[in-house]
Amino acid sequence: MLIIVSRYLIPKGFRGFTFFPFVFLKYRKDTANEVLLNHEKIHIQQQLEMLVVPFFIWYLLEYTYRLIQYRNSQDAYRNISFEREAYDNEKDLNYLKLRSFWQFLKKL
């Protein structure tokens, strides 16, 4: 995991973004935020399992589906299976050691 800090690469309303093998953070102080970094590490694992391009295709398709379903961009984002897995487990710093392959499917 390579961390890059840049205010200009992160969309408004977000603190981090992962594009394997990089984690982009908006604020330098977040390099010490274990919960945020664990959230992004979960996304790295998801991207490794699916390969990067299929991950983002699935992500975009599921976001579009959730946007139609919820009619709210924030609700759509929070209900993407990848995000649900990451948010549900970000505080468990041992989660990735026990995580099953394609675990995000349980969040569909």
Show where each model-derived region lies:
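Short alpha-helix carrying the canonical HExxH Zn2+-binding catalytic motif
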Residues: 33-46
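Metalloprotease/metallohydrolase-associated module, dominated by Zn2+-dependent proteases
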Residues: 2-15, 51-108
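Active-site scaffold of zinc-dependent metalloenzymes
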Residues: 4-30, 34
